[in-house]
Amino acid sequence: MPNGWIILDKPIGLGSTQAVGAVKRNLREAGFGKVKVGHGGTLDPLATGVLPIALGEATKLCGRMLDASKEYAFTVQFGAETDTLDLEGKVIAASEVLPSLADIESVLPRFTGPIEQVPPAYSALMVDGQRAYDLARKGEVVELKSRSVTIHELRLESANAQSATLIAHVSKGTYIRSLARDIARALGTVGHVIMLRRLRAGPFGLESAISLDKLNEVGKGAPLEHVLLPLEAGLVDIPALNLSPEQASMVRQGRVLTGLPQSDGLYWARAGNVPLALVELIAGDARVSRGFNLPDVAE
């Protein structure tokens, strides 16, 4: 069974669940049978860009990918706010105020660092057991609570009289549509997102991404290894812990390793180049927090 990551450059109009379905279909057509597949963070259908898709044992890392920071390029069109905060919605507010380049740059520091943000009514958040977007589509008033997010970096890429394109590096839980709405309001006008592209999700950037056409070649017989990144590609942000054969055997059994000299923290334990587990190291003791069942081809 294949284990690892396919990084899809998701095209516009394709939902994240549909993207997972496309991977499953191509794997099935390539003769791999039933493979566990999951994605590392929902991307709106109208958005494009990096969508990490995990196969096999890599699906155990989807939670980490959901928690990872993301980087986006987005364009906000000034003068109209829509109910969805993007191109799909109907206009609910309008303004003739068009901010200058200096105005835009002057407000960006207010949206850098920890901020409070109200998510869009058209979002996948749960409200009384239902998706917020389902309630909004029924015409119900959706009131979502403000939440704390962090904007690590926000910079202006380009601008004209009607719109501005920005780059944002953000924490998990950040809604770019809400960020665009709030920037426009801070400028004394209104706005909505007309372009959204994810440039990076955790360790994966566009340089690792493949097109849907490239993915479809797998279903027609192209080698999967040409598009599949190894499981450990999703672990580059944490240090590796090299194990002896005896230690590797203990980790496979879920036993605690003791007397280790490394600093406290999260590590990925490996035997040779084979990832065995995520381990939490505290005061010299390493405990398995998530094990991987991979073949010992490189041990």
Question: What does each model-identified segment do?
Answer:
Residues 1-172, 176-210:
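Catalytic cores of RNA-modifying enzymes
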Residues 1-32, 36-46, 186-299:
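Accessory RNA 3′-end/elbow-binding domains used by RNA modification enzymes
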